[in-house]
Amino acid sequence: MEKIVLLLAIVSLVKSDQICIGYHANNSTVQVDTIMEKNVTVTHAQDILEKTHNGKLCDLDGVKPLILRDCSVAGWLLGNPMCDEFINVPEWSYIVEKASPANDLCYPGDFNDYEELKHLLSRINHFEKIQIIPKSSWPNHEASLGVSSACPYLGKSSFFRNVVWLIKKNSAYPTIKRSYNNTNQEDLLVLWGIHHPNDAAEQIKLYQNPNTYISVGTSTLNQRLVPKIATRSKVNGQSGRMEFFWTILKPNDAINFESNGNFIAPEYAYKIVKKGDSAIMKSELEYGNCNTKCQTPMGAINSSMPFHNIHPLTIGECPKYVKSNRLVLATGLRNTPQRERRRKKRGLFGAIAGFIEGGWQGMVDGWYGYHHSNEQGSGYAADKESTQKAIDGVTNKVNSIIDKMNTQFEAVGREFNNLERRIENLNKKMEDGFLDVWTYNAELLVLMENERTLDFHDSNVKNLYDKVRLQLRDNAKELGNGCFEFYHKCDDECMESVKNGTYDYPQYSEEARLNREEISGVKLESMGTYQILSIYSTVASSLALAIMVAGLSLWMCSNGSLQCRI
């Protein structure tokens, strides 16, 4: 009885003072994925995938876009009468064209190398329209009769504003020889065309000469065109067709024209006064009177995130497009509040998900810290040094990832003519392949970084635990749940010394040794008692078994079941 009382007294003494190492927990339900696990609940996380836009066309860095409304690029450059609002346009940040604009080539035909011209425009921010061959400078040809009902203006027949359709005059079409020398310091975009009549009668009616040609030459261009006379279906009321061409005339270079019919001469050209990043974006959106750094056909993106999944085509300083629906980067710890007692999977270091069973919602001023209890009370205290180092480390890592992924680029649609469909299909397959690879890389990066972040937190908790363990040594007992029981009295000053790393082991070692030996002695004495009882029990059992065997043998001998010889 005395031993039992002594044991209870010692147990109550040892249990009194404790210090535990733990980590922060909160009410967060946000989940992340790692290489090893899915749907890991964490205390803090950062979404790095932008999914929202404003649904508007905006200025890009303060520069308005050129929104062509119902006009196409061809209609704008040639001067479709329905596109007069774009006769002179200011600097633009990007060009917006509808998928099927109504005001294209009003007189039916083709625009040669149209896709290449659009690609050129993706590197231009401003044109200045200049007159190179005045309409009044054709005294031997009709320069005002070249109009068509296909290009109406105010209910009357008209024609493209920037070129002149030359017709015979007084039943004659003298051979044209005309040159223009580019004396500007800028490159010049020059446009001209040829008319393909419906039949020979129309050819004679308009140009008098049955066999005509157009020759165009520069230092880099040598072109000779002849009309293709053929019966065709009517488009916009016209059986004839027009084909338009363009070239870039360098400074101090000259363009020379020679023709005896079917010539659509340039009147205006475009001086390229500013080059820069631009794009031709297909979109049906309206202008939103807003400003952005990143524009997509779906709307503007204002985000510092490194990825987005809104549209693969962008202009400006944009996040990278990925096909993912979710990219969440862990910044905090595994969120396992103490009330949630079920065992979680272990992290690399086994700290948070291993020997420590749940976080503390009561510790709100740090990621890692302590909980102590002694005669003076109990309380939580964050380890601010390790917490700050962890915050700095995670913040630097997140910023580094964003910086690496934020290499700005533009992705604009490429257009191909009908003869290049196989190239277009190959290009789409290549772009889809690049997007698939980039999406995979982004998702893998997030999984790996989340694994590293959670292991980083596990390691920090384990390091804090080891810091305490190495200080206390045998002055305290490890309980296996992140806590230590002192073999000596540890007041608040003592607790504080453990937390800040100044614990004086020798000061408490003698008291701890005595208490430790006293507890060990009780255990040994109890062990001896148990051993004696075990021996007595074994001997008694053996004697009882021997007596039973002897009695059974005598009974069998007496009734003849067993022969007994002496």
From Swiss-Prot:
**What parts of the sequence cross the membrane?**
532-552
Question: Transmembrane helix: present as a keyword of the record?
Answer: yes
Would you tell me the Gene Ontology cellular component terms? Answer: host cell plasma membrane; membrane; viral envelope; virion membrane
Which residues does UniProt assign to the signal peptide? Answer: 1-16
Where does it localize?
Virion membrane; Host apical cell membrane
Which keywords fit this entry according to its UniProt record? Clathrin- and caveolin-independent endocytosis of virus by host, Clathrin-mediated endocytosis of virus by host, Disulfide bond, Fusion of virus membrane with host endosomal membrane, Fusion of virus membrane with host membrane, Glycoprotein, Hemagglutinin, Host cell membrane, Host membrane, Host-virus interaction, Lipoprotein, Membrane, Palmitate, Signal, Transmembrane, Transmembrane helix, Viral attachment to host cell, Viral envelope protein, Viral penetration into host cytoplasm, Virion, Virus endocytosis by host, Virus entry into host cell
Record topological domains on the Extracellular side: 17-531
A biological process term (GO) from this entry: virion attachment to host cell
Q: Which SUPFAM superfamilies match?
A: Influenza hemagglutinin (stalk), Viral protein domain
Kindly indicate whether the keyword Endoplasmic reticulum belongs to this entry.
no
Q: What is this protein called?
A: Hemagglutinin
Q: Which organism is it from?
A: Influenza A virus (strain A/Chicken/Hong Kong/96.1/2002 H5N1 genotype Y)
As recorded in Swiss-Prot or TrEMBL, the protein's gene is named HA
